Curated annotation (Swiss-Prot):
Signal peptide: none annotated. Heterooligomer composed of large and small subunits. Belongs to the XseB family. It catalyses: Exonucleolytic cleavage in either 5'- to 3'- or 3'- to 5'-direction to yield nucleoside 5'-phosphates. This is Exodeoxyribonuclease 7 small subunit. It is found in: Cytoplasm. PANTHER family: EXODEOXYRIBONUCLEASE 7 SMALL SUBUNIT. Its EC number is 3.1.11.6. GO terms for biological process: DNA catabolic process. The keyword Nucleotide-binding does not apply. It comes from Ruegeria pomeroyi (strain ATCC 700808 / DSM 15171 / DSS-3) (Silicibacter pomeroyi). The lineage of its organism: Bacteria, Pseudomonadati, Pseudomonadota, Alphaproteobacteria, Rhodobacterales. GO terms for cellular component: cytosol; exodeoxyribonuclease VII complex.
Length: 72
């Protein structure tokens, strides 16, 4: 499942829970599914953030390479 698919399903789950028109057992199942989807999306975002890099420049402003972006 892609990040986008997981987010879309998570939005659907949240919408169902917010409406409050589902039985308790179904609400619990939806909550558990939502928690799993949230974790999956957070993990995917963390992996993506770790891949982000800043371009380093020399004293003349020329690119010399990349380094990880701190604070992400």
């Amino acid at each position: 499942m892609s990040f986008e698919q997981a987010m879309k399903e998570l939005e659907t789950v949240v919408g169902q829970l917010e409406r409050g028109d589902v039985a308790l057992d179904q609400s619990i199942a939806l909550y558990e599914r939502g928690a799993a989807l949230k974790k999956r999306c957070e993990d995917e975002l963390k992996r993506a953030e770790e891949k982000v890099a800043a371009i380093t420049l020399d004293s003349n402003g020329q690119p010399t390479g990349t380094k990880p972006v701190e604070g992400l």
